[in-house]
Structures are given as C-alpha cells and as structure tokens.
Design a protein with these regions (language model features):
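Conserved RecA-like P-loop NTPase helicase motor core
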Residues: 499-509, 560-664
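Conserved helicase motor "Helicase C" RecA-like lobe of SF1/SF2 P-loop NTPases
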Residues: 534-558
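Walker A/P-loop
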Residues: 37-57
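Conserved pre-motif I regulatory segment
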Residues: 1-43
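Conserved RecA-like ASCE P-loop NTPase motor core of nucleic-acid helicases/translocases
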Residues: 69-78, 454-456, 527-534, 657-659
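Signature of the SF2 helicase/ATPase Hel1-core->accessory helical subdomain module
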Residues: 55, 61, 81, 85-89, ...
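A substrate-engagement module of RecA-like helicase motors
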Residues: 2-14, 67-211, 303, 336-342, ...
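A contiguous, basic/glycine-rich beta-loop/short-helix subdomain that forms a polymer-engagement track
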Residues: 177-211, 226-228, 337-502, 508-516, ...
Length: 699
C-alpha cells in the first residue's frame, strides 16, 4: 500500500501543479502504514507541509479498497470547506484513472446543524419564536430573535442543503433553535411529512454511500458518547486540527442549569397535556422557581459574608448546603415530568407532526435536566448515592439508550461544577455549569478502542515532545508519533524577539513602556502587524493608545465581522489587525500584508477558570506539576499557534515580538519557546526594528 500511496501522491501533486515535498511524502507513508497495520499515529505537520493531501491520499486508497469509509474530522468550518469544496474534488479527478472505482465523498454534521422543514412549517407564533420562550424574553430580545427567525424561514425555502454553516449571515443560537431539532427530538423520516425533503436525512444518505466522510469534532464526540450510530460504520478516523479535540469533546459533554431554560421547558411540557390528565410541567415550574430563588438567596448571602465579594461564584467542590434540597427537588421534578410526557401515547399526536416532535423534544430535555442535576449533586460526593430513587435512575431514563448513557457517564468520570452570575438585560443570569474533569477515558475506549486513529495538527509537540497531547487524549507514551517538519526555513526567515526590558505584565492594563515598544515596532514594520492579545480589554486598550501615535489603520476585532476584518487586513498592506483568541488560530495572511506578529503576554488560562483550576489540582494530586501540565501547556499551544501566523508561504519573512519578559526570565519560558517555530531568537530591540525597516523598504 505504501508504494502505491506514494505513486498516487506524485500523480496528484503533478496534476495540481505542485512540487514534491519530503515532509508530505514522509507523512503519507506513515499514515498509510498506520492504516495498514491498524495502529494509532500522531503527526505534527507544520504550515506548508501539505498535510491534507498527506492524509487524504492514503485514506482514499484504503477506502476505495474497502467496504468501510474513512472519517475525516476537523475543528473548523474553514477546513471542512477546503476539504469538500477544493481538495477532495481535485483529488477525485486527478486519481480517477488509478482508483478501482470513482471516489465518493460527503460532509456530515449533526442533525441540529440543518434546518428542520417540519418545524418551520409548524411555527406557532408571528415572531417564529416558541410561545414558551417568547413569554420570557424582553421586547428587544424578542424583536432581534424574531427578525432572525423570519430570515431563517425565508432562507429555508431557498437553501439547497439547509446547513447552518452556509447561512449568508449568522444568527443567534436562540433563533436557530426555533428552526432545528436534535436527532432525539426528530419524529423520524417515515413519520414526518417532510421526510423525503429532509436536509439532514439527505446528508446522512450521501454519507452512507461515501468513501470519505468529512465531519466535525462535535459530531465525532456525539458518536463516542452514544451507542446509537451517528456516523456511517467505519474503522479509520483522521482527526485534523487535533490540538482542539479535547476542548471540543469537553464542550459537548458540558451541561448547564439556567432559570430561563427550566421555565421554558416547564411551559413546553404543559402545552402537551392531554384532556383529563394532570398538567405536565407544573411541578417542574414550581421546583425551578424554588431552585432559582434559593440560588439567588445563597449567592446574595454568601457575597455579603465574603470579603472578596464573590461569594459562591466560581467552582463548587460541594453543593452549598442551602441548595442541596432545592436541587434534589428539581431533579425529581424533571424525572416526574419526563414520565408524565413519556406516558402520553405517541398515537395521541399521530396526525400532528409538530406536537409529535415537541413530545420527543420535551422527553429528551427533561431527561437531560434530570441528568444534569444528578451530575451536579454527585460531583460533590463522588462514589456516594443519596439513596433516592432518582439517584438510582440517573442515566437510565430513556429506556432504549440506558446502557449508552451509563457507560458514557462512567467513562467521563469525575465532574467539575461552577456557578456564574452572567450579565443579562434583566439582571444577572444565575447559571450552574458542569463539565468532565477529563475526557481521556472516553476517548481511549470509545474512539481509540474502536478505530485506527490518525491525529494531526501543526502544533502537537508541546515543549518539543508529544507526551502532553497523548496524555490528554488518553493514549500511552509509546504511541507512534512523527514530526513531518515544514518546508519553511523558520530560522532564516523569522525572528522571535522578547522585550525583556519591559516590566512584567500586570492587572492594570498595558504599561506606558509596552505601548511605546509596540509603537516603535509597528512604525518600523510600516504597519503590517497582527496583534494577538490575551483579552478583549487588552486589545481595545492597546488599539486606543496606539491610534494616536502610529499613522496606520488599526482594525479591531468586534468592530466588524472577523472575515471582513481579515480581508481588509489582507488587502491593505499597511494596516494592523488586533484581536483575541479568534485571531490566534486559523488566520492565514501570506505575503507582504503581514511582517510583524505582536503578542502582549503569555496566554495562560485565567486563574479563576474553574475547569483549568480543577485540572491543575488533579495533576498536583497525581504527583505531577499542575502548572506545567495544564497552564504552561495551554499557553504553549496558543503561543505556537499564534507564532505560526507569521510564515504562511515560502517567501514570507518577519518578526514575532512578545511584550512579556517572562518568556525569557522564567523557567517555563524555555519550555514554551521550544513549542514555537524555530525562529532566530534575540532580546535586542534595535536589531529587530532594523530588520523590520529593511523588510518594509523591500516590500
């Protein structure tokens, strides 16, 4: 298979007008061997390697010679589109003479990513917003949401694929919920009047016949969390942008309790009550009100007794005593409502597809609410039950999927719980969230235990080693790895400059010295700067300070859509673009528009981030270094991604300037630098500014 793959790679590269790349050939060979010998593989492939071809060609060779497709999972929409709209069509054409059959490929996303024609047709209000939710929104929210829903209804009649990611203009999650359903809320294609036109069913049918199925990490997570198959049967998975896998899986497994969602659910349940039966949802509404009032009271009381003024905000290592009974009552009310609605015969709504769908949706939502309450209660007493009937039922409410729920819960293990008072139009939104401490066991058994998995990214070897990423995925240290390198000569094309003379970054914003340093660098570069900041406030403050002292246009994240800002930056060869996390990863601006990447500080996780805090403590308890395993690795990954924005083509040259002396003065600084591209390293500002002036003069 290996020699055949190299032949196919050569054919494809020649057809696409490219040139042979040693790193690409090395990666393609390793991927082919891993698929053939059925072992996992982690590959770091820097910018310019051509990693998508390096894994697609072995995947195509394996899939067209097998009855099973290869699943390719990505973190971002941009990469999914690149694969489906550019790479795979071109490869299908280039390789057609050498393949045993024409290549078939498809994209598959979760059902909730597609508009539901049945839900659109059965909208019950003028605003298009569900009645139960409509009554809880203030006029401005209702107006904005209603306008978006109206636009979605119009789009539903025009779209060819119903895919949310292909909307001409994005909408809020609240608006999208009015026109979509989850897989468990769907009444099924055979019972739905729009079954034959269903966008999700069409996408699933195309995927069932494909050799290569492109999906996202979220759907891959769902496929791992439930026993019912979501993706076509497969035995090989390619995970691109694998550095984001842990976070995406964690996000899917995170749940929350919010007063609004509980109240909406109770109203939805009440609307399903049939004549002569108790009103479903009454007890849930009362329990939700008691829980909300208790939470507000506990928050106010604890805040007044807390000299820091934060009270119960942040991580809970146990449920506050005054909240345990209200939370248990909410759990039991959710279960009772679930039983009430489940007890309504499906035949009751045989001629009403909208209510049939709503019945399933309420059953699913009450089950999830019950499970969330159980997770929060159990997180503070791992290994203990409270003896209640509902506790024994946790994860076993849905009958035909009980085993999957229990197994997934066991694999996710210990949970982390935290409370936030999110700001809202009508005052604070009191939200309690719960997330898994680790997803390693889930990945080990449900992903790696069932498939051959190839994981790849430009950033996997943190501190120069794969050890950290392997541990986060639940893979052993001896898992085969490969650093395919990059065709770019980082040392001769790029400079890493640390402004050691600046004061350490503090909480009071940018120092005068750091603003002056940034201005001198930007002026030397002639603009052409991508500013990566640790927070929105830091980006805004630096932009405000610099706009009075540099003669170049400074574009700021939040002042326009991200795509518009990046396009303006790309076209204007003297502009600067400042922003936060959205710019650290995925921004691709080759050429003369970018010669300076400015980083304000090492992007450690917030010290009050409950999940990161819990993971650090867990690492310490295992005898490791929580700071290095969690905080330093988090920072190293982002620093590597951020620095990787500089060299995007073989002709690019420039400077990565870090305004944080700790990258040089602290012990962990060397570890983070080893995670970054191998640029020439200096502490001399005059040398760097001279290099930037020469680049500006030659552009």
């Amino acid at each position: 298979m290996t020699s055949n793959v190299l032949d196919l790679l050569s054919l494809a590269v020649a057809d696409l007008g490219g040139a042979p790349r040693p790193g690409q050939q090395k990666m393609a060979t390793a991927v082919a061997e891993a698929i053939k010998k059925e072992h996992h593989l982690a590959v770091q492939a820097g910018t310019g390697t051509g990693k998508s071809l390096a894994y697609l060609i072995p995947s195509i060779a394996a899939a067209t010679d097998s009855e099973y497709p290869v699943i390719v999972s990505t973190a971002t929409i941009a990469l999914q589109r690149q694969l489906v709209e550019r790479d795979l069509p071109r490869l299908a054409k280039a390789l057609e003479p050498e393949l045993p059959r024409p290549l078939e490929f498809a994209i598959q996303k979760g059902r909730g990513n597609y508009v539901c024609l049945n839900k659109v047709a059965n909208a019950q209000t003028d605003s298009g917003v569900d009645e139960a939710e409509e009554s809880l929104l203030d006029p401005s929210q209702l107006s904005a949401t209603g306008a978006q829903v109206a636009r979605l209804h119009e789009w539903a009649g025009e779209t060819e694929d119903g895919d949310r990611d292909n909307l001409p203009q994005g909408v809020s999650d609240r608006a999208w919920r009015q026109v979509s359903v989850s897989s468990r809320e769907c009444v099924g294609a055979t019972r739905c009047p729009f079954g034959e036109q269903c966008f999700a069913e069409r996408a699933r049918a195309r995927a069932a016949d494909a050799d290569v199925v492109v999906t996202n990490h979220a759907l891959l997570a769902i496929d791992a969390l439930v026993d019912a198959p979501v993706l076509p049967e497969h035995n090989t998975v390619i995970v691109d942008e694998a550095h984001e896998l842990e976070d995406r899986i964690t996000s899917v497994a995170t749940a929350e309790l919010s007063p609004t969602s509980i109240a909406v659910l109770a109203k939805r349940a009440a609307k399903l009550t049939v004549s002569g039966a108790d009103v479903a949802g009454d007890e849930l509404a009362e329990a939700g009100d008691r829980w909300t009032e208790a939470l507000k009271a506990e928050a106010a009381a604890s805040r007044s007794n807390d000299r820091f003024g934060t009270g119960i905000e942040g991580r809970w290592t146990s449920v506050p005593e005054g909240l345990q009974l209200p939370l248990a009552a909410l759990r039991d009310a959710a279960w009772k409502t679930n039983r009430q609605v489940s007890g309504i015969p499906a035949s009751e709504f045989a001629n009403d597809s909208q209510k049939a769908s709503e019945r399933l949706a309420v059953i699913v939502a009450t089950e999830e609410l019950n499970d969330t309450c159980v997770r929060i209660l159990n997180a503070s007493r791992v290994g203990e039950g409270d003896g209640s009937e509902a506790d024994e039922r946790s994860g076993n409410n849905s009958g035909n999927n009980s085993g999957a729920s229990e197994d997934a819960a066991d694999l996710l293990g210990e949970d982390v719980v935290w409370y936030t008072a999110d700001s809202g139009v009508r005052g604070p939104k009191h939200v309690v969230r719960v997330a898994p401490l680790s997803v390693a066991d889930l990945l080990r058994q449900r992903l790696f235990g069932r498939n051959t998995v190839i994981l790849t990214s430009a950033t996997l070897a943190l501190g120069g080693k794969f050890t950290s990423m392997l541990a986060r995925w639940g893979l052993p240290k001896n898992t085969p790895t490969l650093d395919a390198g990059t065709p770019f000569d980082a040392r001769s094309h790029g400079i890493l400059y640390v402004a050691r003379h600046l004061p350490p970054p503090g909480r009071d914003g940018a120092s005068d010295e750091s603003v002056d340093e940034a201005a001198r660098l930007i002026n030397a570069a002639g603009g052409r700067t991508l500013g990566l900041f640790s927070s929105r406030r830091a980006a805004e403050e630096m932009a405000e300070n610099l706009r009075t002292v540099v003669p170049y246009d400074i574009l700021l994240q939040g002042e326009d859509s991200m795509s518009t800002l990046v396009e303006k930056f790309r076209k204007d060869q003297s502009a600067c673009l400042f922003g936060t996390l959205g710019l650290w990863q995925g921004v691709d601006v080759p050429g003369p528009s970018l010669s300076l990447v400015l980083i304000d500080r090492i992007p450690f996780p917030r010290p009050d981030d409950p999940l990161q805090q819990a993971r650090q403590e867990a690492a310490d308890q295992r005898g490791g270094s929580g700071f290095m395993e969690v905080a330093a690795n988090h920072a190293a990954l982002l620093m590597a991604q951020g620095a990787g924005r500089l060299l995007r083509s073989v002709d690019d040259r420039g400077v990565v300037a870090v305004l944080d002396q700790r990258l040089e003065t602290k012990r962990y600084g060397a570890y983070i630098r080893r995670s970054m591209p191998d640029f020439w390293y200096t502490l001399k500002g005059d040398t760097v500014r001279g290099a930037l002036r020469r680049l500006a003069a030659g552009s």
